[in-house]
């Protein structure tokens, strides 16, 4: 296993890593670095997560690694060896470039980047001591399948840590997310903003999801007119291409229009990727148990007294109240 670095040495290495690529998508992400959040706040968070999950001198898997910032921090601060996985090629390109730049500057960061769906990658069962996922599972196509795969990849006694703030119990976050969904589904201006300001490579061909659904329905050669297609496109929000095709056939056969899911309808019809789900932490806890995990613990994101004292409280109303004050939640689960 790699050596754990002191905070100052790790800080230097991480700054070199973060600025180690001029990938267009990464440059947009990096605009928040040092402005919306500080590197010291980030390092404190990673150290706290290493302590919470026992991620010290371990072999870890990060699911949905993005540009690998957390993976690099887990390796440098915790002495961990990390396999960092993301489904988006643009993300893994950025990770690879940052690792190469950091290495050229003398930083040997124990991160291996792999592109693909965690459910499809050829990884040996029981080969990881821990699995980490931060701000990623809200995009996953099939959470039950992902949790089952993670359970398979962990060794007995291994720990999974999920950190996320896409929390439907937080009123402000929920309303802001629903507003964003409406823009992503309907607005050409928003699609152009994604190309320009968010991820220029990933969103190069972005269009409103409703437009994509209308194109899919129109391509099926039915006798539906433009108004009927528009209504069906609205009703199939949250579906992928195969589901849209099946729903269209059902409607043409005389069945009622489908009803989009309340908290998971902003979805790319072609890739199946969710722009973002509004997650239910209590539902996720139950899904982890159903996937075979033990000792599943749900925690809120407060780390100061008095709210910190309520971590571990099993009362759903108390935790829902806490989540409405701050959306961040953490789930730990053992194999």
Language-model features, listed with the residues they occupy:
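S-adenosyl-L-methionine-dependent methyltransferase catalytic module, highlighting the catalytic core
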Residues: 144-145, 149, 159-330
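Helix-to-beta-strand junctions that scaffold the AdoMet/dcAdoMet cofactor pocket
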Residues: 140-141, 154-156
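Conserved class I S-adenosyl-L-methionine
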Residues: 58-66
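A short acidic, Gly/Pro-enriched loop at the edge of an enzyme's catalytic core
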Residues: 119-130
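Class I SAM-dependent methyltransferase SAM/SAH-binding core
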Residues: 69-120
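A short SAM/SAH-binding and catalytic strip from SAM-dependent methyltransferases
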Residues: 130-141
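N-terminal, positively charged/glycine-rich alpha-helical extensions of SAM-dependent methyltransferases
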Residues: 1-28
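Conserved alpha-helix/loop element of class I SAM-dependent methyltransferases that forms part
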Residues: 36-56
């Amino acid at each position: 296993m790699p050596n754990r670095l002191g905070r100052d040495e790790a800080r230097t290495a991480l700054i070199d890593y973060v600025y180690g690529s001029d990938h267009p998508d990464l440059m947009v992400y990096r605009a928040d670095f040092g402005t919306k959040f500080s590197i010291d706040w980030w390092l404190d968070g990673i150290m706290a997560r290493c302590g919470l999950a026992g991620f010290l001198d371990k072999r870890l898997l990060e699911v949905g690694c993005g540009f690998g910032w957390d993976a690099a921090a887990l390796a440098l601060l915790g002495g961990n060896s990390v396999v960092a996985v993301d489904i988006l090629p643009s993300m893994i390109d950025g990770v690879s470039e940052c690792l190469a730049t950091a290495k050229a500057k003398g930083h040997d960061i124990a991160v291996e980047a792999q592109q693909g769906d965690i459910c499809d990658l050829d990884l040996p069962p029981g080969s990881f001591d821990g699995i980490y996922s931060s701000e990623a599972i809200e995009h996953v196509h099939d959470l039950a399948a992902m949790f089952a795969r993670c359970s398979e990849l962990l060794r007995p006694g291994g720990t999974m840590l999920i950190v996320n703030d896409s929390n439907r119990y937080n009123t402000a976050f929920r309303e802001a997310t629903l507003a964003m969904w409406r823009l992503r589904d309907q607005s050409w201006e928003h699609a152009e903003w994604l190309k320009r300001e968010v991820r220029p490579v990933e969103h190069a061909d972005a269009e409103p999801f409703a437009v994509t659904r209308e194109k899919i329905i129109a391509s099926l050669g039915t006798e539906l007119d433009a108004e009927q297609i528009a209504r069906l496109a609205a009703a199939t929000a949250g579906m992928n291409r195969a589901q849209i095709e099946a729903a269209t056939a059902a409607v043409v056969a005389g069945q009622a229009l489908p009803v989009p899911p309340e908290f998971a309808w902003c979805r790319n019809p072609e890739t199946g990727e969710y722009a973002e789900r509004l997650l239910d932490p209590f539902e996720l806890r139950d899904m982890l148990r159903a996937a075979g995990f033990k000792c599943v613990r749900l925690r809120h994101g407060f780390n100061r007294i008095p709210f910190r004292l309520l971590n571990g409280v099993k009362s759903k109303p108390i935790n829902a109240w806490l989540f409405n004050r701050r959306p961040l939640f953490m789930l730990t689960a053992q194999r």
